[in-house]
Amino acid sequence: MRLSKYYLPTLKEKPAHAKIISHQYSLRAGLIKQIASGIYSWLPLGLLVLKNIEDIIRDEMDKSGAIEVLMPCVQPANLWRESGRYDDYGKEMLRIKDRHEEDMLFGPTHEEVATDLIRDVVKSYKDLPLCLYQIQWKFRDEVRPRYGVMRGREFLMKDAYSFDVDYEGALNSYNLMYKTYIKIFKRMGLTPIGVRADTGPIGGNLSHEFHILANTGESTLYYDNKFSELLESEDVESLKSIYAVADDMHDPETCPISQEQLNVSKGIEIGHIFYFGDKYSKPMKASVTSQDGKNVNIHMGSYGIGVSRLVGAIIEAFHDDKGIIWPESVAPFRIGLINLQTKVTEAADKIYKALKSDEVLYDDTEGSVGVKFSRMDLIGLPWQIIVGKKAIDEKIVEVKNRATGEVKEMQIEEAINHFSTK
């Protein structure tokens, strides 16, 4: 993509209302634009990151055996009355009426819709286990939207729902999603900490939140220092058994590990999984015939990932004082190609044409060298190919690693081959 043909409205100065680095860089790098409190338009560069995150999630969810669906944003209130949850939600639920004066709502979550989706069709234990997921926009009218996409009112979420005939099956589904989440977050370059958590308005008796460590996190995490070692093994039962909790579940008096073993860190929540048995299937009459001929309520779980929140979380984890440093797996473009002067245009064009255009953002604008370098560092593409005077005299370009800052000279053909084969 040629920058001269692209829409990338970057900002030179830090917006005064943006308090944390991910919010500042999201606005300055032209990822998002706020249109109301907690509501954002996603601009081209930000949308590419969002789609790359979605692709990783879809790939791992599909590998787990989950099946993608798409449920409506707007839901009838009667489904929530049926589950008994309509009055549990306060003003964070956006309630509306249609032209027939029927009560509707903009879904903050989809447990009721998911239960309704299967209850008239799934009637036998032979139809289970089943796991359905979607990537869909949601709305929660937060009292204090803040931190950009980290705590917005409208947000993109991956939510999945598992259906099993009994507790053992439901626990298997829960453990599978726990393991799948670890794989998803690790592919994004993140180190997730799974902590025991309160089930909140979703309900149930088993729940884990997934956090990444960040000084700007709103939660305080208490976890055994062995957690990071076990993370590599992806041994779910061991990870679940080790001490790891958020601040609302930590009691210093009953903590089973010593102070020397206990790590205390700030964290950003990026995912949450729940097992809630028949909390929804019982009132909504979602049941199956078991293997021994009995009619039993379906055991359910739900599994959420904040897709749009992940954009902010990744920036919090990967940045410096110059800008964002995207992990290659989620970067909007892999390479930033910088043309430093008009007389090297032919060499820069050659490199651009030789590489995949959807992996390269080619700065072919007439701005100053300083502006070009600053902008490319700000948007944080993993690699920069800098085409200067040596491209004419010696057929040499500079290749910069954005994460390490290391700059290496390469012959033009060498650089083309290097990035064409990776």
Curated annotation (Swiss-Prot):
Keywords tagged on the record: Aminoacyl-tRNA synthetase, ATP-binding, Cytoplasm, Ligase, Nucleotide-binding, Protein biosynthesis
Subcellular location field: Cytoplasm
Assigned EC number: 6.1.1.15
Molecular function GO terms recorded: ATP binding; proline-tRNA ligase activity
Principal location: cytoplasm
Flavoprotein found in the keyword field: no
GO cellular component: cytosol
Pfam families linked: HGTP_anticodon, tRNA-synt_2b
Reaction(s) catalysed (UniProt annotation): tRNA(Pro) + L-proline + ATP = L-prolyl-tRNA(Pro) + AMP + diphosphate
Example GO BP: prolyl-tRNA aminoacylation
Entry superkingdom: Bacteria
Keyword Aminoacyl-tRNA synthetase among UniProt keywords: yes
Xref: HAMAP family: Pro_tRNA_synth_type2 (MF_01570)
NCBIfam families named in the record: PRK12325.1, proS_fam_II
Similarity comment: Belongs to the class-II aminoacyl-tRNA synthetase family. ProS type 2 subfamily.
Quaternary organization: Homodimer.
Function comment: Catalyzes the attachment of proline to tRNA(Pro) in a two-step reaction: proline is first activated by ATP to form Pro-AMP and then transferred to the acceptor end of tRNA(Pro).
PANTHER family named among the record's database cross-references: MITOCHONDRIAL RIBOSOME PROTEIN L39/PROLYL-TRNA LIGASE FAMILY MEMBER (PTHR42753), PROLINE--TRNA LIGASE (PTHR42753:SF2)
Listed name of the protein: Proline--tRNA ligase
The encoding gene: proS
